[in-house]
Amino acid sequence: MWQFDFSEYETTSGGTWRVAGIADYWSKYEYPFHVSPTANQHDAIDAVELALADYAELFGHPMVDDCPVDEHTGQVLPVVTIVTDNGGPFRSFRFEAFIELHPELAHVRTRVKSPGQNGSRERGFGTLKYERLFIDEIDDAVMLAERAEDYRIEYNQVRPHEAIAWNRPKEVHLGMADPNIPNFQNQEILPTT
């Protein structure tokens, strides 16, 4: 399951930018952020395309190759459900048509006025802002995109996460670590005498 939403950030030069973020709920892996002056149906599609391209790069094949096929109908079944709120970009015909063209994806929207149903994504934006964006001045969209990407790399590859047993999201996402089994460095301390 992917959790997807938009967040806003105002730069020091006065521009307000929208950051689209998609995170894998199970592994906590953050896909690349899409930064734009708008948060419309085109931006939503661009963000999903970025995530699909990142998936293909990580796993060496497109996501659709992992889809099971219904043996009775021959229909390709989705392997990822994208969870969004009820914002305009996600209710648009164009976004729904895009999802329909990708049999590997399904889309559900949370209940109206229920941000907690997409709370992991909301919390992810809070962490991005407080750990990376609010600590110094960001002049423009280019700097915003650079800081967001720096955060994403650190978040996915460097720091361990309590929610996935102190493993790193990229390792869990690639199946190199179990999100239920801690991956601590065990240092054996032997007696010196």
Show the residue positions of the predicted features:
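C-terminal domain-tail junction helix/linker
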Residues: 78, 96, 100-103, 127-193
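Short hydrophobic alpha-helix segments
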Residues: 33-34
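Acidic/histidine-rich, metal-coordinating catalytic segments
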Residues: 48, 60-91, 111-115, 165-169
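Hydrophobic (often cysteine-bearing) scaffold residues that line and stabilize catalytic clefts
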Residues: 19, 40, 44, 83, ...
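Mobile-element integrase/transposase regions
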Residues: 1-23, 29, 42-50, 54-70, ...
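Short, conserved catalytic/metal-binding motifs centered on acidic residues
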Residues: 5, 28, 85, 118, ...
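RNase H-like polynucleotidyl transferase catalytic core
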Residues: 81-86, 100-120, 135-140
